Design a protein with these regions (language model features):
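Class I S-adenosyl-L-methionine
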Residues: 1-256
Length: 256
């Protein structure tokens, strides 16, 4: 009898492969200076926005547990890039996380009153309507807060829980202006604020028709094609691009 692999078990149970990299949002379980919302050290994201109306904003990130907080309908449920992120800490969803996030956002508001940008989520997704409502509340509480990211929760999902989360996110997008730029991943029913994979022919057809754009951080500055590792790209990072939070057209990502 064949034993299931760690990946197969994680996919089946809806958890991360790396259970030893999950942390509770609890001061006793975290390092003395450890924060949930971390300064970006990701070369693909950049450390701050260097172009456009948000120029100068420092970039921060939040990482939750993949699959445990995601809808099962996600196209990358099985091949999530979190499968290769064995060093990333994932924070457990729930009231403790939300309480600590509010405290940290208050401090970021104090430190960066002119604006800061939070990328949601490096791993994981919006796990409840209540959690979405908290972000709506925080946008009201902290005027310097700006958010961008992606969600697999669809407003027209067949699953009622996913649909309610997706509709809450859509409502937030419709009512919060440019400060909330969360795109719906794998959605071909909407003409704006989506993020799709180049593996899908519909995405590339939209690019050809100039109804979508390929992420400039993935395109070689020399060849105009997908950039090889180490090759200079059209823009070096998200902070130097800004299209995901300034453009409404769908963005297309090349799977890597």
């Amino acid at each position: 009898m064949k034993n299931l692999s760690k990946t197969e078990i994680a996919v089946m149970t809806g958890k991360t492969i790396f259970q030893n990299r999950i942390k509770q949002a609890d001061r006793a379980a975290m390092g003395k200076s450890e924060l949930l919302i971390k300064k970006s050290t990701n070369v693909k994201l950049g450390k701050r926005v260097t172009k456009g109306k948000w120029k100068g904003f420092p970039i921060f990130t939040l990482t939750l547990e993949e699959r445990a907080t995601c809808p099962r309908s996600c196209a990358h449920w099985a091949d999530c890039y979190g499968n290769n992120m064995m060093y990333a800490f994932r924070y457990q969803a729930g009231p403790e996380l939300e309480a600590m996030l509010e405290t940290e956002l208050a401090e970021l508001q104090r430190k960066h009153p002119n604006g800061f940008l939070v990328r949601l989520h490096i791993l994981g997704d919006f796990y409840s309507v209540g959690y979405v409502a908290k972000w709506a509340k925080w946008l009201g509480m902290f005027p310097a807060l700006h958010v961008y990211g992606y969600t697999a929760n669809q407003p027209d999902a067949a699953d009622a829980t996913e649909r309610s989360i997706g509709q809450a996110l859509l409502s937030l997008s419709d009512n919060c202006g440019s400060r909330w730029a969360v795109r719906f991943s794998g959605n071909f029913n909407r003409a704006t604020m989506t993020a799709n994979s180049a593996d899908d022919s519909r995405a590339m057809a939209a690019v050809t028709a100039k109804q979508a754009f390929i992420c400039p951080t993935q395109i070689s500055k020399v060849t105009g094609k997908y950039a090889a590792k180490g090759e200079e790209t059209l823009v070096p990072d998200c902070g130097a691009c800004g299209l995901c939070w300034t453009a409404s057209k769908p963005v297309v990502f090349i799977t890597h």
